[in-house]
């Protein structure tokens, strides 16, 4: 069979066999400041790992979308350049975040003029830097210094932005810019912040932050992202689990296929009041010791947790909530591992949710040297569980094509090699096949 037919067949089969699930991964523009060897830049991202990459964070200045870090523009170029290696990859710019708070958003959505100013700046900004969409991380409407009217005006803002994106796409004959939002998983916040059916209509993806259910702000230990309610959960804590949060969003009118389940690649840490009392719900004295690389009290990246375990920490499987925790001395961490990710992604697919969201890509063991589980061990569990790794017999076809190029075979079928004039060089075909192998999940 000629190379042209092989390529055409492989592309067709890939399109037919692809997964419909989304795997969105956040990149943080402060990971560049970590000590070596954990400095993480956009060029370090595997372009074939996730279906959507979200760049955190941009900010709002004078009701306009704006950069935050001094070198964001340079990093944008690296980030969006990843699409040259994976033509199916989508990139979104995320604006806001926990530290940005609520006031800036609240002031922007309050008036039609402010909303229009922001929306116009978004379209211009995203097109200029070649993003495919915007992710709004407002934490949270009508909370943390926001206005009670935020709930209503947030919906109006999203509807207006959706209409503006659709209008711009028609006028320019380009693909419509995508819209996603990071939203709360806490019942009280959900009730006060969101008109869920309207969000479900306007947004393409609803990224539910199903993590940080427990942390050092509580008086006792607890899991960061438990799948189910635990026996210790009483009162308002009965709502603090992934299963309840996702079902609540769905029951209030959010389309299941737009609901994206949040997966943390970190754990929340605690300092025990009594090292001998080290179960779930044990009293604490405060946040856990900062990690060597992330350097933030109360939190450890997954690759740091692997170091904690190697240093002799005891790992316990929390059967009731399908997540692990670990302790050593007066230090305690509730987190996720490959086993809990597998259980959760199986639950996700059976529940017919739209996919998984990862916070963050740079806190997984991306080097593969800390946990000895390969590169990106947690995210790869999701990729496989969502059927995004493309394990199918047609991989052999792609490998055959790649090997031919690696051996330097010269292909002379002019209808394949000629792109106008002159004949494509071998290196160009190698680059093309690299992209095709990426698309096929190789």
Region spans (language model):
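Cleavable N-terminal signal peptides of Sec/SRP-targeted secreted and luminal proteins
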Residues: 2-20, 436
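Glycan-recognition patch characteristic of GH18 chitinases/ENGases
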Residues: 16-126, 152, 158-160, 373-397
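Glycan-binding loop/region signatures in secreted carbohydrate-active enzymes
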Residues: 26, 95, 214-236, 263-347, ...
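A cross-domain feature marking catalytic cores of carbohydrate-active enzymes
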Residues: 27-29, 57, 93-97, 138-140, ...
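Conserved, mostly hydrophobic/aromatic
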Residues: 53, 93, 136, 161, ...
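Substrate-binding surface in catalytic domains of secreted glycosidases
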Residues: 64-73, 141-305
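An active-site-proximal structural segment forming one wall of the substrate-binding cleft
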Residues: 110-134, 157-164, 191-202
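Cleavable C-terminal sorting propeptides in eukaryotic secreted/cell-surface proteins
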Residues: 418, 422, 426-442
């Amino acid at each position: 069979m000629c190379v042209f037919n092989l390529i055409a067949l492989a592309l067709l089969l890939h399109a037919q066999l692809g997964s419909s699930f989304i795997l969105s991964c956040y990149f943080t523009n402060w990971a560049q400041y970590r000590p070596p060897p954990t400095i993480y830049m956009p060029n370090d991202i595997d372009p074939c790992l996730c279906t959507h990459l979200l760049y955190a964070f941009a900010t709002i200045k004078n009701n306009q979308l704006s950069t935050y870090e001094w070198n964001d523009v340079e990093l944008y170029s690296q980030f969006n350049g990843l699409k040259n290696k994976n033509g199916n990859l989508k990139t979104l710019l995320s604006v806001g975040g926990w530290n940005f708070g609520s006031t800036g958003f609240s002031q922007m959505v309050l008036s039609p003029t402010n909303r229009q100013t922001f929306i116009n700046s978004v379209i211009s900004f995203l097109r200029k830097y070649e993003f495919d969409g915007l992710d709004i991380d407002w934490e949270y409407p009508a909370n943390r210094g926001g206005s009670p009217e935020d709930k209503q005006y947030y919906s109006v803002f999203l509807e207006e932005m959706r209409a503006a994106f659709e209008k711009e796409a028609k006028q320019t004959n380009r693909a419509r810019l995508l819209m996603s939002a990071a939203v709360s998983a806490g019942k009280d916040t959900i009730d006060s912040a969101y008109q869920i059916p309207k969000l479900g209509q306007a947004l393409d993806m609803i990224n539910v932050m199903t993590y940080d259910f427990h942390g050092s702000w509580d008086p006792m230990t607890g899991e960061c992202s438990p799948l189910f309610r635990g026996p210790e959960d009483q009162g308002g804590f009965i709502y603090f689990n992934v299963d309840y949060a996702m079902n609540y969003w769905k029951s209030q009118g959010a389309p299941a296929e737009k609901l994206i389940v949040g997966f943390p690649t970190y754990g929340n840490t605690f300092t025990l009041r009594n090292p001998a009392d080290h179960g779930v719900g044990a009293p604490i004295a405060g946040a856990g010791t900062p990690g060597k690389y992330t350097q933030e009290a109360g939190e450890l990246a997954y690759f740091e947790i692997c170091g904690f375990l190697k240093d002799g920490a005891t790992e316990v499987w929390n059967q009731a909530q399908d997540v692990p925790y670990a302790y050593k001395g007066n230090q305690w961490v509730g987190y996720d591992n490959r086993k809990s990710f597998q259980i959760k992604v199986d639950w996700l697919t059976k529940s017919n949710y739209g996919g998984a969201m990862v916070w963050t890509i740079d806190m997984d063991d991306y080097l593969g040297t800390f946990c000895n589980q390969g590169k990106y061990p947690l995210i790869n569990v999701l990729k496989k569980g969502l059927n995004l790794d493309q394990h199918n017999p047609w991989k052999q076809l792609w490998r055959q094509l790649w090997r031919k190029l690696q051996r330097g075979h010269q292909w002379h079928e002019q209808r394949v090699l000629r792109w106008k004039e002159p004949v494509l060089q071998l290196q160009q075909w190698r680059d093309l096949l690299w992209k095709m192998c990426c698309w096929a999940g190789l």
